[in-house]
Amino acid sequence: MSHKPPKGLYFDIPLSSVYNKGMAETPSMPIIINLERTEKMEKIASFTIDHIKLKPGVYVSRKDHVGAETITTFDLRMTSPNDEPVMNTAEVHTIEHLGATFLRNHPVFGSKTVYFGPMGCRTGFYLLLAGDYESKDIVDLVKEMFIFIRDFKGEVPGASPKDCGNYLDMNLGMANYLAKKYLDEVLADISQDRLVYPE
């Protein structure tokens, strides 16, 4: 009786690399990536947003419940997706260091800050706060943070080989510039259509 293997991609991995490096003979084991399963997976929330209509702004991306606590994820979109050039990694990295430092030291939101970091597409950042918030609730906080980044001079916090895994990939001048652009063009007089995701 023959058994048909499941659909997928097959890779032969030496067992010695998994169990015992040093075996004289290393039989292989098949590693299967099931393509059918990935085809049935639902899109994550951020992939359901129409990025063609999306403008730079401050949006609630999602809300998650962990025990009795609500975690609100904000989309701090700094550039127009697939329209403006994306930010380079050096300035993104600098904004991450400065933004995280500002938030963790904030007198009100410091203890509520779960995470601040860049989107993989390099068009903005995600901010996760403990609590149930709407976009309008954090506009002042985001303004404060980007004023801090715009005006920052000197050594970027954590930009040393001891503190960071890629400390040379920094561009403070461009981080200052992008923070000013976001403040002037988006945050200064933010409209409702930049606080709620497009339909």
Protein language model features and the residues they cover:
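Aromatic (phenylalanine/tyrosine) cluster motif
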Residues: Y10-F11, Y19
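His/Glu-rich zincin catalytic helix
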Residues: S17-Y19, I33-L103
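M16/MPP (pitrilysin/insulinase) zinc-metallopeptidase core fold and M16-derived inactive scaffolds
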Residues: P81, P85-D137
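Histidine-acidic residue clusters that define the catalytic metal-binding segment
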Residues: D184-E199
